[in-house]
Amino acid sequence: MAMQSETPGNPASTVDPAEIAKFSKLSAEWWDPTGRMAPLHKINPHRVAFIRDAACRKFDRNPKSLNSLAGLRMIDIGCGAGLLCEPFTRLGAQVIGIDPSATNIAAAKVHAEKSRLLIDYRNTTAEAMDPRERFDIVLAMEVIEHVTDVGAFLGRCAAMMKPTGLMVVATLNRNWKSFALAIVGAEYVMRWLPRGTHQWDKFVTPEELTRHLQNSRLAVTEQAGLVYNPLADKWNLSADMDVNYMMVAESAG
């Protein structure tokens, strides 16, 4: 399959070309639950449940329903190969997945076709999206630690929300613990990810993320951490936000 440019041109883009190249190399491994993306596969059910439950509370839906998100428009910014797009499509959402890496989008399209799912995948950036498009749910999961300007990026994400919509952001805290676990542990000891996947100085503290969201006229309504138990080899939602964490934000009115 022929690939187009990896970085859709946009003068205001917050995309970092080096980050795109890094994740493009991993595109063939996205859907291997035992490969380098194994940690994402293990945390994915918890991410899906957290987002689903937040959306159901917001839009008065039954989280136990197989179509709990039916009719809701969702965009997953930096969707990779679609690990979140597919489960939310199965829950009834109308999903658009965007990624600046053409190879990631190609991998996403192939897997969606195999899974017989209709997902609108686009090789583009948040900044290049039609400003008239609005969504009930905007996802920016494990993305902001890879952009060049967090505030500008989140401002663009906020502009894509409907007035009654919500945004969910996931990222990594910046402290000694996240350096030890997310970089030394994940990249050098466990070798879950290639060395250099993350840059510790680009991690974002919950306080910083909250301020960025407030600057975009959003208010944080929910938050949770994701904690790894090495003895059980399992991830769980937790109040501990020292390393991986997620936030839900809505219009501050």
From Swiss-Prot:
Keywords: Methyltransferase, S-adenosyl-L-methionine, Transferase, Ubiquinone biosynthesis. S-adenosyl-L-methionine binds at residues 47, 78, 99, 141. Pfam families: Methyltransf_23. It is an enzyme of class 2 (transferase). Gene3D superfamilies: Vaccinia Virus protein VP39. Pathway: Cofactor biosynthesis; ubiquinone biosynthesis. It comes from the Bacteria. GO terms for biological process: methylation. Its EC number is 2.1.1.222, 2.1.1.64. InterPro entries: SAM-dependent_MTases_sf, UbiG_MeTrfase. GO terms for molecular function: 2-polyprenyl-6-hydroxyphenol methylase activity; 3-demethylubiquinol 3-O-methyltransferase activity; polyprenyldihydroxybenzoate methyltransferase activity. It catalyses: a 3-demethylubiquinol + S-adenosyl-L-methionine = a ubiquinol + S-adenosyl-L-homocysteine + H(+); a 3-(all-trans-polyprenyl)benzene-1,2-diol + S-adenosyl-L-methionine = a 2-methoxy-6-(all-trans-polyprenyl)phenol + S-adenosyl-L-homocysteine + H(+). O-methyltransferase that catalyzes the 2 O-methylation steps in the ubiquinone biosynthetic pathway. Belongs to the methyltransferase superfamily. UbiG/COQ3 family. This is Ubiquinone biosynthesis O-methyltransferase.
